[in-house]
């Protein structure tokens, strides 16, 4: 295994000081962790600074920490915030590295085999390698991940044992180093020097680690001894400085040595023979022929190249696991005494629970029809109970914790006071009879004060009809439906904040990135229709959308008071009472949050003049104009990727492809 660097403490850098009930929450969380408490809940109201509290806890308990979010967008936002809080420590990002992913599948009803098709994002792949190498080299590591962290990753022991350790003065021939690099899946490329490659110039070997994007390393030999090792700029070759120790981790997470590979191949062949015998005994000759052809090809590739497309489907044999045994995941790269924080746990824990079943249903079909060996079923995400077995200490973070989290612990730390002094909004319940005219009057009041309104409906038809009616009444309104992609969605939020329109209508306004301080009214139609968006948790989340404005107000239109409505109203009133008392005791006057508009939407536009599909008539452009548009979009795509807004970058990429097809 790799010798870790000397322990370096987490050092939090921030211009803010804990305020409101953050100090109490931080102290309680830290005391409980240091006291050995396994699970606890940080129940933080919207806008109370939960991420800052999490950062304070990490800096004080000083443990390697895994922060899990329920999608890439949220993970990217958290990654950016933690990078700012901990500039001197290793803050890493680990999400699925696919821009596009079509899993391998088979549909028996139409005899359709769908081959795996994917597009790997090179930047995210680099960040994944950076995360695993940091975990093996140091302890001051925060990894912000999506639920993809519970998917199979390869053995951390094999990954670490395969690493190549180099020092000046070390006796090793140049050719031996080259062979070692090939063994850990580095490719020789003397022309196109990129991640996961090396090039050779006489007695000089330059290596580009899989975890880097700008800096590579030059290893200079004198005979069969390393003379010196330098860090260099990958593009220019300019020397940055000398290093006294270089560890090169494998270029792929699925790696094994030659001896282990032969053992793995023998196991694959034995399983193949067993499955072929089963198919033939059942008269499934087509399935047997299909399985033999595919598996023997993969075996040949593994033997000759040490790798094959879909190698993860043989991970059980390569890792030496028993049938049904859980795969190695990112969690196995952490030391035993690490901390897990689950952001928006009411969403994330549900995802963790659901991943396994969906994966197994698809793969079982591939096994039954001879596309994969049964061992492919063990290349899978963890079950929830297997995830739980990795938990040493965990903090669930949510404004509305789910039933699962509540069943895991009685330790609940509340964070209700906002640093800005803002209160949870007042709530009115009004009858549905005449609700549209009543709502129109409320909207006009907000428009007169240059404030915005959210309206949430239960059906697409209701949202569309209401949008049409309000437009007829002269209201500037837009409807945000599920088909709207990231680029358009961020454009809509930006326009709402700028006052291009005043009212936003949607079915699910709980998604990330739509906390708008200018919104002073949230109207909930059909509030008495129980369901996912009208249960206590959904209502509290929706109510929170009005908690960023000092004049925040919520109107529920309903003909009866449901239990969910009553509990949401009671909980909001309880929090509001606590907040009022705190403000009064400390002489705090609530203030609307001031939030930079561009910061809200990342970089969907770098300026008003940037190019988007909605605004430009590309078909009427000349070829030269389209070429200019493509260049501008490529620049925006790179900027999006650098800021980790990969969904937006993918949108830009798709638009660029469309434009290229026009020529």
UniProtKB/Swiss-Prot annotation:
It comes from the Bacteria. One of its GO terms (biological process) is nucleotide-excision repair. Keywords: ATP-binding, Cytoplasm, DNA damage, DNA excision, DNA repair, Excision nuclease, Helicase, Hydrolase, Nucleotide-binding, SOS response. This is UvrABC system protein B. ATP binds at residues 44-51. The beta-hairpin motif is involved in DNA binding. Residues 627-662 form the UVR domain. Residues 1-10 have a biased composition (Basic and acidic residues). PROSITE patterns: HELICASE_ATP_BIND_1, HELICASE_CTER, UVR. Residues 435-601 form the Helicase C-terminal domain. A motif (Beta-hairpin) lies at residues 97-120.
């Amino acid at each position: 295994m790799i010798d870790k660097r000397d322990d370096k403490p987490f050092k939090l850098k921030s211009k803010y000081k804990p305020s409101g009930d953050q100090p109490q929450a931080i102290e309680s969380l830290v005391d409980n962790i240091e006291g050995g408490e396994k699970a606890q809940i940080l129940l933080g109201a919207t806008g109370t600074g939960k991420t800052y509290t999490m950062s304070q806890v990490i800096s004080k308990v000083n443990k390697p920490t895994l922060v899990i979010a329920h999608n890439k967008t949220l993970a990217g936002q958290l990654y950016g915030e933690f990078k700012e809080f901990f500039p001197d420590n290793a803050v890493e990002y680990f999400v699925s590295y696919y821009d596009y992913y079509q899993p391998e599948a088979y549909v028996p009803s139409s005899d359709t085999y769908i081959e795996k098709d994917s597009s790997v994002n090179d930047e995210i792949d680099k960040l994944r390698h950076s995360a695993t190498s940091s975990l093996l080299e140091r302890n001051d590591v925060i990894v912000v991940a999506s639920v993809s962290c519970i998917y199979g990753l390869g053995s951390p022991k094999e990954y670490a044992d395969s690493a190549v350790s180099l020092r000046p003065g070390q006796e090793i021939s140049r050719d031996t180093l080259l062979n070692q690099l090939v063994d850990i899946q580095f490719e020789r490329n003397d022309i196109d020097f990129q991640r996961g490659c090396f090039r050779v110039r006489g007695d000089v070997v330059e290596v580009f680690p899989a975890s880097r994007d700008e800096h590579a390393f030059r290893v200079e030999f004198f005979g069969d001894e390393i003379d010196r090792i330098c860090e260099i700029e990958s593009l220019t070759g300019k020397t940055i400085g000398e290093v006294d120790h270089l560890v090169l981790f494998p270029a792929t997470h699925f790696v094994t040595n030659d001896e282990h590979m032969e053992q793995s191949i023998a196991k694959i062949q034995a399983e193949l023979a067993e499955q072929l015998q089963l198919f033939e005994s059942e008269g499934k000759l087509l399935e047997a022929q299909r399985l033999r052809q595919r598996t023997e090809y993969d075996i040949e590739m593994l033997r000759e190249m040490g790798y094959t497309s879909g190698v993860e489907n043989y991970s059980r044999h390569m890792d030496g696991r028993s049938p049904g045994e859980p795969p190695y995941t990112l969690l196995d790269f952490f030391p035993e005494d690490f901390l897990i924080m689950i952001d928006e746990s009411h969403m994330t824990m549900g995802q963790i629970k659901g991943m396994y079943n969906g994966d197994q249903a698809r793969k079982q079909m591939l096994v039954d029809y001879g596309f994969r060996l049964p061992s492919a079923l063990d290349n899978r995400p963890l079950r929830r109970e297997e995830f739980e077995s990795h938990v040493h200490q965990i903090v669930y973070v949510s404004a509305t914790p789910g039933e699962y989290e509540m069943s895991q612990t009685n330790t609940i730390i509340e964070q209700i006071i906002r640093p800005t002094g803002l209160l949870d909004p007042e709530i009115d319940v009004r009858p549905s009879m005449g609700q549209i005219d009543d709502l129109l009057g409320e909207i006009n009041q907000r428009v007169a004060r240059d404030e915005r309104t959210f309206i949430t409906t239960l059906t697409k038809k209701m949202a569309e009809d209401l949008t049409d009616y309000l437009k007829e009444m002269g209201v500037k309104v837009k409807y945000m439906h599920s088909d709207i992609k990231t680029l358009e969605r961020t454009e809509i939020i930006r326009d709402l904040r700028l006052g291009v329109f005043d009212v936003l209508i949607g079915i699910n306004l709980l998604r990330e990135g739509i906390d708008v301080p200018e919104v002073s009214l949230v109207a909930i139609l059909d509030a008495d229709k129980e369901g996912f968006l009208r249960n206590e948790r959904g209502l509290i989340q929706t109510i929170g959308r009005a908690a960023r404005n000092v004049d925040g107000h919520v109107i529920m239109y309903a003909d009866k008071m449901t239990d969910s409505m009553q509990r949401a109203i009671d909980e909001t009133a309880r929090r509001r009472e606590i907040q009022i008392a705190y403000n009064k005791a400390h002489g705090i006057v609530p203030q609307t949050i001031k939030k930079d508009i561009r910061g809200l939407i990342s970089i969907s536009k770098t300026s008003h003049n940037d190019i988007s599909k909605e605004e430009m008539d590309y078909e009427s452009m000349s070829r030269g104009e389209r070429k200019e548009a493509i260049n501008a979009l490529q620049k925006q795509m790179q900027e999006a990727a650098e800021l980790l807004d990969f969904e937006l970058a993918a949108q830009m990429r798709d638009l660029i492809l469309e434009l290229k097809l026009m020529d």
